[in-house]
């Protein structure tokens, strides 16, 4: 007996003749036949309902040989349980070709349900209205479909492989570009570092030369004045001494003394300018600061009643000065001032202000505490919560500190930049036109939140432009 036949025999032995499936909890009747416990009990229950009379109480006919067997004498068949389990775990190829319901060969294919069926299934109500074809025909049809699908998948695989190769090439190209850019950044910053070092040395040398020239002029003037002072002192002593002599002695050689006095008139030295020509300008600094630039907008509710705020994009006034302007607690009443809507308590911030002012128009720019006095005239100093640069007289721009350290400029700035580093406690002012540094406030920390601060002087003194808002005082 070959292996296939042996497997078939085992399947037959492990199959219940009632349910035509492998045994589940098999039991043996007194006549020696085996059935699933549930199958034989259901069969006998059905027989009990159909036949009210039995030849022997508690006995039922065997479904195989019809011999009566007492229901109590059903014995578990443990060996058959193991055989059924083995067959269930290792079905033969032929068993897989059998219908699980009817144990018939699967010779047909249901197109509607897309699964093989047997001849008995074909006649069932479930499959009778369905399109059914021989399984060989279905195999040929689906083989063609599978070939088409496989060909399509092969083409898609080729496309995927090409795309993968392209992406890998792109990745390598990208990494090479990043490498080159990283090296370029290193080189350029190294060059910039050298350039900045050279520029620093150039500025320091220019400043030193300017210092030496001015010091030499001032020292020369000082020496000349000192010499004149000594000559005048000697002549004064001679005159004092002559004044103490007798009248005749005093009048001797009076003409010579008086002529010497006339020749010793003070020679005033030429005025030496102490306006520094060497500008503190770091190349590229303004461009770096612009990376922190923000649109600062003046707050109309804080503006002095006669301070006009005009929004150029919206083409409208943000505030209309009039006698009946509401005077809230945030509005400035002592000076033509306003603060920005922004409140800064951290971070770095940069903004610019355009200056279109006339003559010696007074103004102030910077930051202030959010709780500064707005009703009373107080000095705009850090002690009062103001960190500003303001115009004093002529072209002198004084930081509002005590004592003030005026900065004299050749030309008034038409565009100023303000940089705030809150955590560092630093506020710096720049001429945005040429990038030169004007002044810095440096302290351990600011005492609290800050707001941009803008102040103008008398009417018709000019305008300030902050972002898209123009400020001026109504005349």
Swiss-Prot record:
Subunit structure: Interacts (via coiled coil) with TRIM44 (via coiled coil). Interacts with TRIM28; this interaction prevents TRIM28 activity on BCL2A1. Interacts with TRIM41; this interaction prevents TRIM41 activity on ZSCAN2. Interacts with BECN1. Interacts with NFATC3 and NFATC4; these interactions prevent NFATC3 and NFATC4 nuclear localization.
Binding site for Zn(2+): 99, 102, 121, 127
Name assigned to this protein: E3 ubiquitin-protein ligase TRIM17
PROSITE patterns hit by this protein: B302_SPRY (PS50188), ZF_BBOX (PS50119), ZF_RING_1 (PS00518), ZF_RING_2 (PS50089)
Keyword Zinc assigned: yes
Location in or out of the cell: Cytoplasm; Lysosome
Organism expressing this protein natively: Bos taurus (Bovine)
Reaction(s) the record says it catalyses: S-ubiquitinyl-[E2 ubiquitin-conjugating enzyme]-L-cysteine + [acceptor protein]-L-lysine = [E2 ubiquitin-conjugating enzyme]-L-cysteine + N(6)-ubiquitinyl-[acceptor protein]-L-lysine
GO biological process, one term: protein ubiquitination
Zinc finger (B box-type): 94-135
EC identifiers of the protein: 2.3.2.27
InterPro entries: B30.2/SPRY, B30.2/SPRY_sf, Butyrophylin_SPRY, ConA-like_dom_sf, PRY, SPRY_dom, TRIM/RBCC, TRIM17_PRY/SPRY
Boundaries of every B30.2/SPRY domain copy: 275-473
Coiled-coil boundaries: 135-246
Pathways per UniProt: Protein modification; protein ubiquitination
Keywords, ordered alphabetically: Coiled coil, Cytoplasm, Lysosome, Metal-binding, Transferase, Ubl conjugation, Ubl conjugation pathway, Zinc, Zinc-finger
Gene name for this UniProt entry: TRIM17
One example GO MF annotation: ubiquitin-protein transferase activity
Predominant subcellular localization, coarse grouping: cytoplasm
Tagged with keyword tRNA-binding: no
PTM description: Auto-ubiquitinated.
Function of the protein: E3 ubiquitin ligase that plays important roles in the regulation of neuronal apoptosis, selective autophagy or cell proliferation. Stimulates the degradation of kinetochore ZW10 interacting protein ZWINT in a proteasome-dependent manner, leading to negative regulation of cell proliferation. Inhibits autophagic degradation of diverse known targets while contributing to autophagy of midbodies. Autophagy-inhibitory activity involves MCL1, which TRIM17 assembles into complexes with the key autophagy regulator BECN1.
Record family assignment: Belongs to the TRIM/RBCC family.
């Amino acid at each position: 007996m070959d292996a296939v036949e042996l497997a078939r025999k085992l399947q037959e032995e492990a199959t219940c003749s009632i349910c035509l499936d492998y045994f589940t909890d098999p039991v043996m009747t007194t006549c020696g036949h085996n059935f699933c416990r549930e199958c034989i009990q259901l069969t006998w229950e059905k027989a009990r309902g159909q036949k009210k009379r039995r030849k022997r109480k508690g006995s039922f006919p065997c479904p195989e040989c019809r011999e009566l067997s007492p229901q109590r004498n059903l014995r578990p068949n443990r060996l058959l349980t193991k055989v059924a389990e083995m067959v269930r775990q290792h079905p033969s190829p032929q068993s897989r070709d059998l219908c699980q319901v009817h144990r018939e060969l699967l010779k047909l294919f249901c197109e509607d349900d897309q699964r093989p069926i047997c001849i008995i299934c074909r006649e069932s109500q479930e499959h009778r209205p369905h399109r059914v074809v021989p399984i060989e025909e279905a195999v040929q049809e689906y083989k063609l479909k599978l070939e088409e699908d496989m060909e399509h998948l092969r083409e898609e695989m080729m496309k995927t492989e090409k795309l993968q190769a392209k992406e890998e090439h792109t990745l390598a190209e990208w990494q090479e570009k990043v490498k080159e850019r990283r090296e370029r950044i290193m080189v350029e910053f190294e060059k910039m570092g050298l350039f900045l070092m050279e520029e620093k040395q150039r500025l320091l040398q220019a400043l030193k030369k300017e210092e030496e020239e001015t010091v030499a002029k001032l020292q020369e003037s000082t020496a000349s004045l000192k010499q004149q002072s000594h000559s005048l002192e000697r002549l004064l002593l001679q005159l004092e001494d002559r004044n103490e002599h007798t009248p005749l002695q005093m009048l001797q050689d009076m003409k010579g003394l008086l002529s010497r006095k006339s020749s010793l008139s003070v020679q005033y030295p030429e005025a030496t300018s102490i306006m520094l020509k060497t500008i503190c300008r770091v190349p590229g600094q303004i461009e770096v600061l612009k990376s922190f630039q923000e649109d600062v907008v003046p707050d109309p509710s804080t503006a002095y009643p006669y301070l006009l705020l005009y929004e150029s994009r919206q083409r409208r006034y943000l505030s209309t000065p009039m006698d009946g302007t509401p005077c809230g607690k945030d509005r400035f009443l002592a000076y033509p001032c306003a603060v920005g809507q922004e409140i800064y308590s951290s971070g770095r911030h940069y903004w610019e202000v355009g200056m279109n002012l006339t003559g010696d128009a007074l103004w102030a720019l910077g930051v202030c505490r959010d709780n500064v006095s707005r009703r009373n005239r107080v000095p705009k100093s850090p002690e009062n919560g103001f960190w500003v640069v303001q115009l004093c007289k002529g072209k002198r721009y004084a930081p509002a500190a005590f004592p003030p350290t005026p900065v004299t400029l050749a030309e008034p700035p038409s565009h100023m930049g303000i940089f705030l580093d809150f955590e560092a406690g630093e506020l710096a002012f720049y001429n945005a036109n040429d990038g030169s540094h004007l002044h810095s406030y440096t302290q351990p920390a600011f005492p609290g939140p800050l707001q941009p601060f803008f102040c103008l002087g008398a009417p018709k003194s000019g305008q300030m432009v902050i972002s898209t808002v123009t400020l001026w005082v109504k005349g």
